[in-house]
A protein has these predicted regions:
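Nucleotide-sugar donor-binding catalytic core of glycosyltransferases
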Residues: 1-155, 159, 163-183, 194-232
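Short loop/turn elements that flank and shape the SAM/SAH-binding pocket of Class I
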Residues: 191
Length: 232
């Protein structure tokens, strides 16, 4: 059906980049579109980037009580290790072009990053709570993209006040939009010991994180836009 009145579009949540395989221009050019709240979305004046957040509630990493407990008991940033954790990353089977590409990219990145003297690797998968205990010990956490740029690990790290490290993707826009602490590299070749030592001394602001990780923050953004555009 044709939409003939102003609207705010909300879509989610998917590990795939929204613009993969098709153009989103018809949506963005719709004359009545006010804003589009979207996961794994490119930067655009009409798009508000949404996080994919934590795992589904049926999985251990989606249990709200467990997440809240980990957050409440997190180690203060200044007491964490001045090192980077490279957690265990699933290598996606090549069931799709995205899965094949993600698997190959992760294998290459893991080989390169695990050789760095300031990086500690987690070779085997741990139960979620044990994994979060390990994560909490480090100031910095590698977040290698999967079938899409956004992954749950970004938010697991932020919940523990660890700094996520990503390759430069559309995720840099999400972090910038919501004022979240994070490091982004155009190539892993640019991550060396001298640069890392400089990053250790940065003053990271985790103030916006605790608000951002609540559903209310995103709901309030939507309500604010609704109120601003009444009678549009």
């Amino acid at each position: 059906p044709h939409i003939s009145s102003p609207f705010i579009l909300i879509t989610g949540t998917s590990s795939y980049q929204v613009s993969n395989g098709c153009s989103i221009d018809p949506i963005l050019q719709h004359p009545f579109l006010i804003k589009w709240f979207c996961t794994n979305a490119p930067a655009h004046a009409k798009i508000v980037p949404l996080p994919i957040g934590f795992q589904e509630k049926e999985r251990s990493g989606g249990n709200q009580e467990s997440i809240s407990e980990c957050h409440a008991n997190k180690t203060p940033f200044e007491r964490k290790k001045d090192r980077i954790l490279l957690p265990y990353h699933i290598i996606h089977p090549p069931h799709s072009p995205e899965g094949k590409r993600a698997g190959e990219s992760r294998v290459k990145a893991i080989e390169q990053l695990s050789s760095l003297p300031f990086v500690d690797s987690q070779p085997e998968k741990l139960p979620w709570k044990d994994y979060m205990v390990l994560l909490d010990k480090y100031k910095f956490v590698m977040c290698l993209e999967g079938t899409g740029p956004d992954i749950h690990r970004n938010y697991e790290a932020l919940a523990l006040h660890c700094v996520p490290i990503n390759i430069k993707t559309i995720m840099e826009n999400l972090f910038g939009f919501h004022r979240l602490p994070g490091l982004f590299f155009s190539s892993w070749d640019h991550l060396n010991e001298d640069k890392f030592r400089n990053y250790v001394d940065f003053n990271y602001n985790f103030g916006p994180v605790d608000v951002f990780l609540k559903v209310k923050y995103h709901a309030d953004l939507i309500k604010k836009l609704q109120n601003e555009n009444r009678g549009f």
